Amino acid sequence: MHRTTRIKITELNPHLMCVLCGGYFIDATTIIECLHSFCKTCIVRYLETSKYCPICDVQVHKTRPLLNIRSDKTLQDIVYKLVPGLFKNEMKRRRDFYAAHPSADAANGSNEDRGEVADEDKRIITDDEIISLSIEFFDQNRLDRKVNKDKEKSKEEVNDKRYLRCPAAMTVMHLRKFLRSKMDIPNTFQIDVMYEEEPLKDYYTLMDIAYIYTWRRNGPLPLKYRVRPTCKRMKISHQRDGLTNAGELESDSGSDKANSPAGGIPSTSSCLPSPSTPVQSPHPQFPHISSTMNGTSNSPSGNHQSSFANRPRKSSVNGSSATSSG
């Protein structure tokens, strides 16, 4: 598995900052012709004197450029979630502005325009925020009972859950170490922190978990843990040593066979016929033909002669053929 690469916020700044004011996007607005984004107040003020994009010089509109710009809520949410404290500071600035200028018309604006939206309502989580979470043991039997719509809860099940308050920047690895030290779990066992039935990565922070699984703040962040034996793995060096020893044993056995009197004789145990199997001739198709060398014929064994005693046999002696009977 490949670990997710974590990059610095400064590497993303070119995609999160407005080229007109040099700050992070506030009320991000995108030109639909070229998809370049700017702060709303920055691009509106710029288009009062120009009808072209500040970045690529594409014509926004011939006469009414404000018709071809759109508010980009998705991009703005990304900026608020990536830049720590930006949303909270912006809401404070808006509240201070309307407090200093009571005559400003904010009645038609939304709560966010007036700075009256809290981080909890916007689901924005900062690194220094304290998150409430619950941790309990993952019991497969209890899960099966839940699937079977068994709604009865015993006192033991309720007491298994523990509640913690942790910084949003706390990682799953820190939570695993806390559980190991709190419950004295030996190193021969592995602890998995889970959300529902899915194990979590060690480098996930509580803020990452809240964003990934869309935690709504309607209760503590529900986490579970399980304990299982650590899988033992044989070291590669041990495996290589075993293979080397096996090779040496095979070579030793081969040399012993070569030095033994029967070392050069191939094994024929698998080729021996059984008592019920008839003996086959070297020429199974023509058993009556025998080979001749230098005028002498090679006769078969005594047992073989008896089986073919009554059959005529041809042989050639010094170029002349003769027929003899047994």
Swiss-Prot record:
CDD domains: RAWUL_PCGF4 (cd17165), RING-HC_PCGF4 (cd16736). GO terms for cellular component: cytosol; heterochromatin; nuclear body; nucleoplasm; nucleus; PcG protein complex; PRC1 complex; ubiquitin ligase complex. Pfam families: RAWUL, zf-C3HC4_2. Residues 164-228 are annotated as: Interaction with E4F1. InterPro entries: RAWUL, Znf_RING, Znf_RING/FYVE/PHD, Znf_RING_CS. Monoubiquitinated. May be polyubiquitinated; which does not lead to proteasomal degradation. The hPRC-H complex purification reported by PubMed:12167701 probably presents a mixture of different PRC1-like complexes. Component of a Polycomb group (PcG) multiprotein PRC1-like complex, a complex class required to maintain the transcriptionally repressive state of many genes, including Hox genes, throughout development. PcG PRC1 complex acts via chromatin remodeling and modification of histones; it mediates monoubiquitination of histone H2A 'Lys-119', rendering chromatin heritably changed in its expressibility. The complex composed of RNF2, UB2D3 and BMI1 binds nucleosomes, and has activity only with nucleosomal histone H2A. This is Polycomb complex protein BMI-1.
